[in-house]
Amino acid sequence: MQKHTIAVLGGTGAEGGGLALRWARAGHRVIIGSRAKERALAAAAELNALLAKWDVAPVIEGDANAAAAAAADVVVLTVPYAAQVATVTEVKDQLAGKVLVDATVPLVPPKVSVVQLPAGGSAVAAVQALLGEGVKVVSAFQSVSAHHLRELDHEIDCDVLVCGNDVPARETVVALVADLGLRGIHAGTIANSAATEALTSVLIAINRRYKVPSAGIRITGLPAAE
């Protein structure tokens, strides 16, 4: 397994923190990023305390967004839609030549169970257009519920659709998904992120209808190796 330095921007939240925790357990160096370094350090300390319960060394660090992104080779964006562009703009100079994994979902409260894609069709595709092809933007994790991510003994029962224009970057993210204990599925170019972003609202509607916390998706009919 190739080891990465992963900056999780928005790692103080439920999804980002859960991903950070599982990647750290898998042996990656993880840096929590936040607008305020103090919040990032506090979140890192909390996550390291959880790792200690599993006899894993405290390997999660915390820093301001720009510093975290500068130190990483893979940057993961897990901020709310309203903060997406501002966060990307803040760290733009630190992203050149790197893989940016964007988990943004264009949810517009209060109707989060209704699909409301932006005018351009995809929030993540808009970030690729903003950054240019010098940054390898990959869309992933929109269909993964944060509900059980911090419970390291809980198996997350879903696949992860991975979209991006750069195939090697997609391969990197599919491998990182596997390190979480999940299956990553190559789902085409960044334009297809519109479909994965829309799925989140569909899954929220399913959760509400069936009174469950973490409905997910499975892709069937693939070769066993996939």
Segments from the language model and where they lie:
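General beta-strand structural signal in soluble alpha/beta enzymes
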Residues: 62, 136-140, 185-187
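Rossmann-fold NAD(P)-binding glycine/threonine-rich loop
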Residues: 104-147, 151-152
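Rossmann-like NAD(P)-binding element
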Residues: 54, 59, 63-99, 106-111
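NAD(P)+-binding Rossmann beta1-loop-alpha1 motif at the extreme N-terminus of oxidoreductases
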Residues: 1-49
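Short beta->alpha connector loops
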Residues: 80-83, 143-144, 166-168
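Phosphate-coordination loops involved in phosphoryl transfer and adenosine-cofactor binding
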Residues: 2-5, 97, 157
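Active-site-lining helix/loop region of Rossmann-like oxidoreductase modules
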Residues: 158-226
